[in-house]
Amino acid sequence: MDVPKLLEAASLLVPAEIASENDITINDVWDYLAHDEWEVALGLLEELGDVHPLPLDFWESLATAAEQMRLERSAAWCHWRCYEARNGIIRADLALRPASENRRRTPFSGAGVLRPMWNIGNRTPTGEDDLNIALLWVEFIPTLGPGERASVRLAPLDPSQWRHLQPGHTITMHEDRTIGGTAVIVEVQGPMATPAP
């Protein structure tokens, strides 16, 4: 399917009554599509998808369109949102420890490439901390470095291990056995789509 058709298909899944913080509506998207402004339309659709939960098909169409336009970060974000539609959303405020107290010395990309371990309160059969792995997406900034703080989204490798988390819970991030950062859960939502068997 070509880019305009993918964007049109995604647009049809957006309720007419929703608007972004900047009062962007689906009518604005249709105007940009009519003028072949596909990249702008894609960005507006991503923004509308952050306002109101939209189905997996919406994010899959946007991911394919972004890939065809070679917009790597947009494609990565839309694939991330596909994961969230299937498995749920976990958002947190993360504070990394300073370089003097942490293994990490340099910033990392915020685009969902870091896969740290997390202490989320689970225990091994012998009572030791059981660390769980989750990809990390940093919101609103491209990188995050030692001593910095940001809003993040987490994509657990095994979402069932994370179901007990609630807003207000504190979890710790580990790139080795030492604590690299502390996060406070701010949002937990269930999946929009039924996971594939």
Language model segments and positions:
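C-terminal effector/interaction modules appended to NTPase cores
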Residues: 85-197
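C-terminal-biased regions
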Residues: 1-88
